[in-house]
């Protein structure tokens, strides 16, 4: 079907199948649509709310057009959020990825520049001295040798440049805000995915099933796209094609409730200071606890099922300063 027919289908309020969505997003990523067509399409999908098939199709097109990453055959994970929760916190997922790697897990973190906060994953890593523009081969080498690598979205999904001016002009959430975590070019075995709105938990979970994720968690923590300690975290666990929904409280991690305010971050330089202190075992207790809770859930994907024990192990590990050594090694690639 031609793009125009697919667009017409959207304009008339009809949804697209996965294959139709893949075809349309292929056209977008390959620069075959005008800015006006892209804008109209994004708004049509926003007004009706994109369904699982449409999101899965957009993910498929993104991965088909992505720069290739030499995928390892050992199990590895991604921990990544949509961003856009408007909370301006420290970089929790980035810290958790480094901590988990220094404890023996393998993490290929997909990330980008800031969406709505002052400091996205690549912003803070750059401030920490990490080269976010390494080649896929160098990134793979880091994953092999130190257990963690960072895949900069703009480097792998260059076709998204066709959408950038439209997204900037629209100034509103679109389907592209929810694609990021789902389009890691390394195609991880496991995923811990944070979403900025509670209603996205179900959408994401169903999309993860459609994408045949082996084992994933989708989380929304009382306004955060992370596991929260200031309130409840809504969770969807996707395993072998089935979804289980539940909530987690700070008590489930053996931790006390703490304020969201205690996680406020700042510019990349400020967040880099917070992360350095944390990884050296000298950070704020609230930062350590939040990263421990998120890392604990990430480790569960690797078969470490006891969240409270995981938290204790992470907190002890942070005090050892070994996580900072992993960060220092990451800066050498």
UniProtKB/Swiss-Prot annotation:
Cofactor mode of binding and number, as noted: Binds 2 magnesium ions per monomer.
GO MF, one annotated term: anthranilate phosphoribosyltransferase activity
EC number of the protein: 2.4.2.18
Entry GO CC: cytosol
Cofactor field: Mg(2+)
UniProt binding sites for anthranilate 2: 167
NCBIfam families on file: trpD
Protein name in the entry: Anthranilate phosphoribosyltransferase
Gene: trpD
